[in-house]
Amino acid sequence: MLEPKGYNEVQEFGEYEKLAPGGHVLRILKVEETTSRNGDDMIKIYLDTDKTDKQPGFFKKRYDSDTRANKKWGCIVNQLVIDTKTGLASRGLKTFHTCVEKSNSSSFKLIWGDKYAANFKNKLIGGLFRNEEYEKQDGTTGWSVKCMAFHSVGAVLEGLEVPEDKHLDNAVAPGYPVTNSVVAAPPTNDIPLPDDNDYPF
C-alpha cells in the first residue's frame, strides 16, 4: 500500500473518556438570556466540571480534542424563565438560583436586571447527570450523558443516587434507584486544568 495523502497530518482517534453518570461539581462559565424556538424567554447555562470534581475540566478537554469545524460546547442547559402552564416564574429557574446560592455561600447574591447573566460567571453548582438514549441521523440509537437536574455542591459531595437511564420511549425516569453513589474527589496533579482564558467564550 502506498501512503495516503495527508497521512502524517491526520489526528488518530484517542481514547474516549465518558462522563460518569451521577453527581458532579460544576463551574458556570456563562449564562445567556435568549428565547426558545417557541419564543419563550429562557437562559442558556454553559457549564464545565470544576477542578474539584472527579473528572475536572471534562467538557473543555472534549471540546479541545474535537477536530470538527462545527464543534459545539458539550454541556449547555436550557432553562425556561416562565412556566408556560401557570405564567409564573418556573420552578426550574428558582431551583437553579437556589442551588447557586447554596453552593457559593456569601460570594453570590442574585442580581436582577442588566447584570443578571454576568452574576453567575465562575460560580459553582452541583449537577446530576444520567445516560440518555438518542436517535442518530442514520436512524440508529446512541447514548450520551446529560445534566438532568441541579443540586447544591454540598448534595453532590454527600453523594447523589445515580438515576436510571432515560430510554427514547421513556418520558420520565421513574425515581432514582440506587445503583452507585458518586462522590466528588480532588483532582490529580497530572491533569492540566483550564483557566478562564482557555474557554472559547
Regions found by a protein language model. Give the residues of each.
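Short beta-rich binding modules
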Residues: 1-201
